Amino acid sequence: MSTPENDQADGPRMRRGRRLAVDVGDARIGVASCDPDGILATPVETVPGRDVPAAHRRLRQLVAEYEPIEVVVGLPRSLKGGEGPAAAKVRRFTQELAKGIAPVPVRLVDERMTTVTASQGLRASGVKSKKGRSVIDQAAAVIILQQALESERVSGRPPGEGVEVVI
């Protein structure tokens, strides 16, 4: 018979609550969300990314609307795990986002190969390249969120690295 005490021994615990994922790109920012149980990640929208203050405003609105327990942001790394100019740009973007949505925590998670995987998935499902541009960032955000959820499900700890708000 399963009791709360026995359930603890069954493995790591995952926090309950909706999360948002953000895939930051130069032109577009993909956003995804999950259900409160962290089972299914779904696309939310693509936010225009060239006007960074406007993008931050829209992301703050989405955080207010979805009320997530945290926001995970994909951190682009090289295949060897290093960070280049794109990662530095995402770190700056994420720092500003974290300030704007505090006290909601923001975490950076490895996003290696998510856009490639999303692109392959869209092509396999018959999405044409022109239409795909408008949803590729959302699809990448879904993959980022699914990976973050799986990481927490396995480890029982929040995924990636926390972003400290520097004022």
UniProtKB/Swiss-Prot annotation:
Keywords, A to Z?
A: Cytoplasm, Hydrolase, Nuclease, Ribosome biogenesis
Q: What is its main location?
A: cytoplasm
In terms of InterPro entries, this protein maps to: RNaseH-like_sf, YqgF, YqgF/RNaseH-like_dom, YqgF/RNaseH-like_dom_sf
The EC class name is: hydrolase
EC number, as in UniProt: 3.1.-.-
Q: Name one Pfam family in it.
A: RuvX
Q: Which GO terms describe its molecular function?
A: nuclease activity
Q: Which GO terms describe its cellular component?
A: cytoplasm
> Which SMART domains does the UniProt record give?
YqgFc
> What GO biological process terms are annotated to this protein in UniProt?
rRNA 5'-end processing
Superkingdom of this entry's organism?
Bacteria
Which compartments does it reside in?
Answer: Cytoplasm
Question: What is this protein's function?
Answer: Could be a nuclease involved in processing of the 5'-end of pre-16S rRNA.
Similarity comment text for this entry: Belongs to the YqgF nuclease family.
Protein name, entry field: Putative pre-16S rRNA nuclease
Naturally occurring in which organism (per UniProt): Streptomyces coelicolor (strain ATCC BAA-471 / A3(2) / M145)
The lineage, from the top, is:
Bacteria, Bacillati, Actinomycetota, Actinomycetes, Kitasatosporales
